Amino acid sequence: MSVQSHPPVVCLLGPTASGKTAAALELAARTPVEIISLDSALVYREMDIGTAKPTHEELASVPHHLIDIIDPLESYSAAQFMTDAERLIGEIRARGRTPLIVGGTMLYYKALTQGLNDLPQADATVRAELDALAAERGWPALHAMLAEVDPITAARLAPNDAQRIQRALEIHRLSGQPMSALLARQADARTFTGAADARYRVIALEPSDRAVLHARIADRYDAMLKGGLIEEVERLRARGDLHLGLPSIRCVGYRQVWEYLDGDCDFATMRERGIAATRQLCKRQLTWLRSTPERIGIDCLAPDYVARVADAAGW
């Protein structure tokens, strides 16, 4: 069978706490699928509670991919996801099964469907220099530095968004040009012709009432805290080789608990920060989803939302 004759790959996207995992598992009961995780936090081993990782029973009920694949000391890029996902789609189809992509890391989705921008590769020396500078001056100071050389990028980043500030400054140091200018130039030159529309069917879980989703987020974070999130972070800290500069420890929820264990805040403040950070993540995910014209929107609060997803998927 040629690539063109395959049905589109269904991508079930949505913000945190929108019911993606539950919907995916119900869909798996209807169709012989294998799930490809589109989640930058689920790739890490030893990080189960704060990532809302599917349970062992759920993982055993249907094949899952790109979960528990790296150590928290390591990093996993959008480029790696793109390569892995494309390979997995082919392998799953070769087994006579249906790939189902599920998650909320929109950068991964963009990489898979539109390709990656040709930006300079990460440079360990430059990153170490920026980390040292941040340790001395703080990330808001580096954000101010970024504003001087790339005001467009700086304007869309929070002063404490360490990972993105570091990447933008790294690109400027390596290329001598603002990241925003490089991205704009590459967008103008891109020959991508909209293959995402043909190869992927995007189903987006979007709440009709954001307040309900916000309440879910608070309840879920409380459940994580009661379920052992603090103890999970304590085990990560006990390793001795992890720190707040790593993408794994900067994951929403983990960072706030880590800072709490550092003595930076009390329990109530940590809880508030964790919920607020999760809601901010949700807001960014929804903004990105709603800027995706090819999506099929489904109200994740509707009682029959799983049936609607199945209909949209053609299953």
Curated annotation (Swiss-Prot):
**Domain of life the protein comes from:** Bacteria
Keywords tagged on the record: ATP-binding, Magnesium, Nucleotide-binding, Transferase, tRNA processing
Spell out the SUPFAM superfamilies in the cross-references: P-loop containing nucleoside triphosphate hydrolases
One Pfam family here: IPPT
Q: Which InterPro entries match?
A: Dimethylallyltransferase, IPT, P-loop_NTPase
What's a single GO BP term from this record? Answer: tRNA modification
Q: What is its EC number?
A: 2.5.1.75
Which reaction is catalysed here? adenosine(37) in tRNA + dimethylallyl diphosphate = N(6)-dimethylallyladenosine(37) in tRNA + diphosphate
> Where is the site labelled Interaction with substrate tRNA?
T105, R127
UniProt xrefs under Gene3D superfamilies: 1.10.20.140, P-loop containing nucleotide triphosphate hydrolases
Any one GO MF annotation of this record: tRNA dimethylallyltransferase activity
Q: What class of enzyme is it?
A: transferase
Task: Give the protein's cofactors.
Answer: Mg(2+)
* Interaction with substrate tRNA: annotated span: 39-42, 163-167, 250-255
**Any idea which positions bind ATP?**
G14, P15, T16, A17, S18, G19, K20, T21
Annotated substrate binding sites: T16, A17, S18, G19, K20, T21
**Role description:** Catalyzes the transfer of a dimethylallyl group onto the adenine at position 37 in tRNAs that read codons beginning with uridine, leading to the formation of N6-(dimethylallyl)adenosine (i(6)A).
PANTHER family in the record, alphabetically? TRNA DIMETHYLALLYLTRANSFERASE
The family assignment reads: Belongs to the IPP transferase family.
> What is known about its subunit structure?
Monomer.
Q: What protein name does the entry list?
A: tRNA dimethylallyltransferase
Q: Lineage of the source organism?
A: Bacteria, Pseudomonadati, Pseudomonadota, Betaproteobacteria, Burkholderiales
